């Protein structure tokens, strides 16, 4: 007997098999008829037999259905079936195929009665069985995730999110839901989306003061951490910068963590390394369901061929294994600048000359992680003025703060974190020096240092960047269902 998920519908229970549930029961011995629903990935008619590959989005693997052809009516019926159509299939029988790539297949002996066409497609349905570039697929936001390559990245995203939840729960973190609407700019960069209503003449009339979409939930997390000790969130964040690059979005998701009783940057980096390695280990253990079975060339203007599946799969597996097995390095920002200057002056010039006191550029980050260390690297202790106001100042004379960025090969920075300044007077002086809090808009934040404060710190992980890196696709537009950038209008 096949086991299926059971749902309540209209007061009655009914069972529904999925493609994934069939793969999970490959060793069954039941001869019961099988019913399943899905979309046609491909169909091929030969002289006496037809092969139909069905997908339903639950598995990276399609379901092979074999249809013996016994008369012309069956042939004519199958000729109307096309890629992308929705089918409801009944009375299929299980056939074990242990010596083939797919360990089983379904067989239908009366396709006219057993196959019901539920949803047709138009004559110009764009997702035919042919090579398509990622650039082209991005122009099809309502259909692109029906492809094997892009649906797999969403399943990976779902899996990784679930693994984070399990890990944090096991380690006594509380998941919280901080607000999206805020009156503050956490990063101090001024690149904010201001919120107004369609009936209010000014942006401040609804809430009584200017209100924005959050760029980070960190300030609110600090409030909650001082009650819960350990908390985390996965929330949408918004930045109104004009960057249209493979690494930037106007709307993205940030996994943010805040912990009390943290006294050193090393405590934060050790926790980050342990956490990420735990997530990667779970991915490796489930690689058969996570690794895509189709790849699309990163050369988006070249639509001539698909890349070798085995080669691409091995590259992803190697990346995952290296994240676990390779040494993660730890250097200061000052050390990083020295390394970059030597490369810039002695080997080849960067586009942006590395200078102490200036933020690291993407090319610098990629060189450090991808060429110099060839592994993840934590860069710590940045100059104070390179970073936001809330970071804890180091006791050293070099005017740096206790912070870190995690750089990974091929992508650059994916995580940033810091100790938070818990000294009331130092925090006030820093904000005054930056011209902040002149109207008392951050008094609530500063006052936390007077009401049972504790040493604390945390970090934020750009979720799309992390998923893109794991998947081997370094354009984060493909790691979020509906990407938003300044370069493209929002049509829905």
From Swiss-Prot:
What Gene Ontology molecular function terms does this protein carry?
A: asparagine-tRNA ligase activity; ATP binding; nucleic acid binding
Describe the reaction catalysed, as an equation.
tRNA(Asn) + L-asparagine + ATP = L-asparaginyl-tRNA(Asn) + AMP + diphosphate + H(+)
State any GO CC term: mitochondrial matrix
In the UniProt record, the signal sequence range is: none
* Protein keywords: Aminoacyl-tRNA synthetase, ATP-binding, Ligase, Mitochondrion, Nucleotide-binding, Protein biosynthesis, Transit peptide
Q: Which domain of life is it from?
A: Eukaryota
UniProt-listed Pfam families: tRNA-synt_2, tRNA_anti-codon
E.C. no:
6.1.1.22
Q: What is its main location?
A: mitochondrion
The places in or outside the cell where this protein is found are:
Mitochondrion matrix
Name a single GO biological process.
Answer: mitochondrial asparaginyl-tRNA aminoacylation
Q: What does this protein do?
A: Catalyzes the attachment of asparagine to tRNA(Asn) in the mitochondrion.
State the family named in the UniProt similarity comment for this chain: Belongs to the class-II aminoacyl-tRNA synthetase family.
Quote the record's miscellaneous comment: Present with 784 molecules/cell in log phase SD medium.
Q: Which PANTHER family match?
A: ASPARAGINE--TRNA LIGASE, MITOCHONDRIAL-RELATED, ASPARTYL/LYSYL-TRNA SYNTHETASE
Q: What is this protein called?
A: Asparagine--tRNA ligase, mitochondrial
